[in-house]
Structures are given as structure tokens and as C-alpha cells.
Amino acid sequence: SKHPNMNLVIVRENEEDLYGGIEHRLTPESVQCLKLTTQPGCERIIRYAFEYARSHGRKKVTCMTKDNIMKLTDGLFHATFDALAKEYPEIETDHLIIDIGTARVADTPEWFDVIVLPNLYGDILSDVAAQISGSVGLGASANIGTQTSMFEAIHGSAPQIAGQDVANP
């Protein structure tokens, strides 16, 4: 890796945003996808990021949004971040617009500690960060719920060897 001191955690919302599954066809020639952002959803994931930082000795939480354009949806995420940050005075905070933040992760990932983002941005940024660290296939993933969690293997699904009895799932 070009960044041997890279040590960041990406916390992404995983139920809302453009991945909420709210899509429909308007006409035969046009479709629409709606971006869902709720106060409880924002608070849940942002609080998780701060609690993770606190419990793991992390010093900084960075929020990334595109609230310069999406003033209501991403604005709610950013405003919730700013409000909750006051409950964690020992943790440094900052906010970056997602395109600038992604460029900074690509250039200087060591600058980051914990990053919290809405769903789509987190999906993209986590793959960028994994590739910077060596390979998209090396990015571990955990979906943490209040009652159930799901963990994804870092090696990929290897469909080319499925059914050959050569790998331990």
C-alpha cells in the first residue's frame, strides 16, 4: 500500500438514502429514485459513529455530505451531526463535502479517523478506501443492527469455485 499508516473506519447509514428502494417509473422514458432521510436514521448512525470513536480511542469523527446541493436531505444529516457532536466534546469533529472528502481520502487517508456518511456516499467511499489500502477485495464489512448483525467476508464470494468443494464458506 502507498499508505501504510492508513487506519480509518467508515460508518455508513445502511437503510435509507437512495438505497431505500423507493423507485418508480414516471413514464415509459423516465424513472425516479427518491432519497429518504429521517431524523431517527441520521441520529442512530451518527451516534453509533461517535460511540464507536469513544469506545475505541478514536480522536476524530468526520461527516461527509453534499449539503451544499441537497440542502434538505443532506442538510438534515449534517445538522444532526453538528447537534450530536456537542455530546462528545472530547472528540474532534469536522465536515467535508463528499467530493472533496473523497479526494482527500484518496490522497491522504491518514488524515482521517472515523468517517460517517449517508448510505450511497459510504458505499462508494468504502470501496475507494479499500482500493487505496491494497484492494477492494480486502475491505471488511459489518452491518450492525440493534438485534441482528451481518458480517461480510473480505475475500469476496468466489463464484468461479462454487460447488467444487475447494473452499470453506
Show the residue positions of the predicted features.
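N-terminal glycine-rich phosphate/adenylate-binding segment common to multiple enzyme folds
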Residues: 1-35, 120
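Short acidic, glycine/serine/threonine-rich loops at helix termini
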Residues: 20-24, 72-77, 105-108, 127-129
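A glycine- and small-aliphatic-rich helix-loop capping segment at beta-alpha/alpha-beta transitions
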Residues: 25-29, 77-84, 131-142
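Glycine-rich phosphate/diphosphate-binding loop of Rossmann-like nucleotide-binding domains
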Residues: 28-99, 111
